[in-house]
Design a protein with these regions (language model features):
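N-terminal secretory signal peptides that target proteins for export/translocation
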Residues: 1-7
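Generic marker of residues within folded, mature protein domains
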Residues: 6, 26-28, 60, 188, ...
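A conserved amphipathic helix/loop scaffold
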Residues: 408, 412-650
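Compositionally biased, intrinsically disordered/low-complexity regions enriched for serine, proline
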Residues: 19-22, 189, 485, 508
Length: 650
């Protein structure tokens, strides 16, 4: 009996030992819903050779932002890391529970502020690229390529090699060869188990012109990474809109539908106010990035304080980023000041958003098709996102979607008209932009509806919703005098198509949203302003009418001013985020009768407005609203530069 008891006791402790020893190690950052990585550029190797410097910087960064991983760079702009110090530095981090992976910036530096890439027609540049890859492969099992792996050179050798090909075709073909011959094969020859991750930048509309290739190249690498840095939307040269930090990660998830998109990456550049940095962090994580990389180690470790920037308009409001709370939360290492810096801005903001991410399911949105290697109405989806339309961008035609949104870039699919017809014939709907209509009007789209862009433009400031004999009402905001918007003129046949939203200039009407029944589906044409950013200047009534048709059966839709985004998830949760400098009030419409809505952060249960089942004769329009399910409406006050998280239950 005693022997049996001892055997059972031994078996119990041995089982416990196995369970503990086989459990995955705890990550240093301690976040529940994501990992945090910090990218160390190549010059860190020189500083980190002094272990006292390394220890001091490590303590400082970890006190500001808890992190799980570092990407340690071995090459950038003609500079190599000291190989002799790499293993020692790696051990320092791994001994403290931090994962260490490699980094490469395969670029040659630039001139006059422009980015410079290798000239891959030069043997010495090809050799240097290969050498850098081989060094990384010797020291790391995972290596990420920073987003300078493109091709700008137009040397005499490049011009001769290009021949009669376009620059786009030449660069795509060249970079496909470079990817295999100078990166993947050399790395795997040295380290067969290596994983090479390619980070793609934020200018996805123009990739093909510089040799980036989401169609083939992105599939060859072991994973991809997403540049979600959007910075300031008004003063930078790119003018990227805030919504892109979410949208581009979702798009790249669909490019690598096998789960190969490893995360999002932001930096601290070109910011006019401190809130803009956490907004990029939050939006990357609202897109469900499994990892977020902070570029770079230096601003995380710097001793210099940062300025909150131009945020006087909202600094006393209850915003999601609270400058004072962030400053007071920092406990510096002994002997250092408590001055705030970007590291603590990141750390505080990540800690806050980690509280709610677990309540969000898988992101969903209105599906929009952008073929590989396509351009047209560039970055339009981010402007649509910023007027409150959740977008799910995909490189494959989404035949399963109830409605497909097609912008001008869809013209790069030679079979797009046939796909549209098939979709409509199956009882589903298609909405095309005026840019795509113009591109296809001599390529078969008139088989669906004989509408065309005339080439003329008109300035519109008055808008009407509703249609039918004597029906319609102003969509202008009586409290705000909206500016005039320049739009293309679309010609159509009366009674073949109906303008469910129209603009009026003097005594003439111009369609903003056209509707046509084709087979079993509905075909829409959405007129896009000549300046896409004028979507922000459309009256709120116009954008809400567009949403009613585009999101007819969508779980949640939002009546809102511009610069307020909506992120929706398949478990009924959603996020409302304002990028505005002022307070805003929105109305969210949730599918279902008497749905309960709860603020996921405060626990507050919101009071519903009178439930609206669409359409109703007492609505202010007669037939402007499409048939749809019963919905429950709620009014929500949103502070400036803030997000609110909600969960629903029937």
């Amino acid at each position: 009996m005693q022997h049996t008891f001892r055997l059972a006791l031994f078996s119990f402790f041995f089982t416990c030992f196995l369970a503990v020893s086989s459990a995955p190690p705890a990550l240093a950052g301690g976040y529940r819903n994501f990992r945090v990585a910090v990218y160390c550029v190549v010059d860190a190797a020189q500083r980190f050779a002094d272990e006292k410097v390394l220890q001091a910087e490590f303590d400082r960064v970890m006190a500001r932002v808890k992190f799980d991983k570092v990407y340690f760079e071995v090459y950038r702009n003609r500079h190599f890391a000291d190989e002799a110090s790499l293993d020692k530095i790696k051990r320092f981090f791994t001994d403290r529970g931090v994962i260490v992976e490699g980094g490469l910036t395969l670029a040659a530096g630039g001139r006059g502020g422009q980015f410079g890439t290798f000239d891959f027609e030069k043997p010495e540049d090809r050799a240097e690229c290969k050498k850098a890859v081989q060094i990384a492969a010797r020291h790391f099992d995972t290596v990420i390529l920073d987003d300078f792996f493109f091709y700008t050179s137009k040397s005499d050798a490049d011009i001769a090699a290009k021949g009669k090909r376009s620059w786009t075709q030449y660069r795509l073909e060249t970079m496909r060869k470079v990817s295999t011959e100078l990166v993947l094969k050399p790395a795997r020859a040295i380290n067969p188990k290596i994983k090479i991750i390619i980070k793609y930048p934020n200018w996805y509309e123009h990739f093909q012109g510089l040799g980036y290739d989401l169609e083939e190249q992105a599939q060859w690498f072991d994973g991809i990474y997403t540049g979600t840095e959007t910075r300031d939307p008004y003063v930078t040269d790119q003018l990227l809109q805030q919504y892109e930090s979410y949208e581009i990660l979702r798009y790249f998830n669909n490019v690598r539908s096998d789960g190969g998109n490893r995360g999002g990456w932001i930096d601290t550049f070109s910011l006019q106010y401190a809130d803009r940095y956490p907004e990029q962090l939050w939006d990357t994580l609202f897109a469900k990035a499994p990892e977020i990389t902070l570029f770079s180690w230096h601003p995380m470790a710097a001793l210099e304080t940062i300025d909150p920037g131009d945020r006087d308009a909202w600094k006393k409001k209850p915003t999601s980023f609270n400058w004072d709370d962030m400053v007071n939360s920092y406990k510096p290492p002994k002997g250092e000041s408590a001055a705030p810096n970007w590291g603590r801005v990141a750390g505080w903001s990540l800690e806050q958003v980690d509280r709610c991410l677990g309540k969000l399911g898988n992101p969903i949105g209105v599906k929009s098709y952008k073929p590989f290697q396509s351009t047209g109405e560039d970055f339009i989806h981010n402007y649509l996102g910023n007027i409150g339309i959740p977008i799910e961008l995909t490189p494959k035609f989404p035949s399963d979607a109830d409605i497909v949104l097609l912008s001008e870039s869809a013209k790069f699919d030679r079979d797009i008209v046939a796909k549209m017809k098939k979709h409509l014939a199956s009882g589903k709907n298609v909405m095309v932009t005026s840019g795509l209509l113009r591109a296809l009007q001599d390529k078969g789209i008139k088989d669906i509806a004989e509408a065309e862009a005339t080439g003329r433009t008109v300035s519109i400031r008055d808008f009407i919703g509703g249609f039918g004999a004597g029906k319609g009402a102003s969509l202008n905001d009586p409290k705000h005098d909206n500016p005039a918007v320049l739009v293309p003129e679309i010609r159509f046949f009366t009674n073949d198509m109906w303008a469910v939203v129209r603009g009026v200039a003097a005594a003439r009407g111009f369609p903003i949203l056209l509707m046509n029944h084709y087979a079993k589906g509905i075909f829409y044409v959405l007129t896009i302003p000549e300046n896409i950013s004028d979507l922000y200047n459309l009256p709120r009534g116009v954008t809400s009418a567009i949403k009613a048709h585009l999101q007819q059966d969508f779980p949640v839709r939002m009546d809102s001013p511009a610069q307020v985004a909506l992120f929706v998830y398949d478990n009924g949760a959603f996020v409302v985020e304002s990028f505005r400098h002022d307070d805003s009030e929105v109305t969210v419409s949730v599918k279902g009768d008497h749905v309960k809505l709860k603020n996921a952060l405060t626990g507050e249960v919101l009071r519903e407005l009178v439930p609206v089942s669409e359409p109703k004769e007492k609505n202010r329009f007669f037939r402007d609203q499409p048939m749809g399910p019963t919905r429950t409406n709620f009014k929500i006050a949103v502070p400036p530069h803030s997000y609110l998280v909600f969960t629903t239950e029937e």
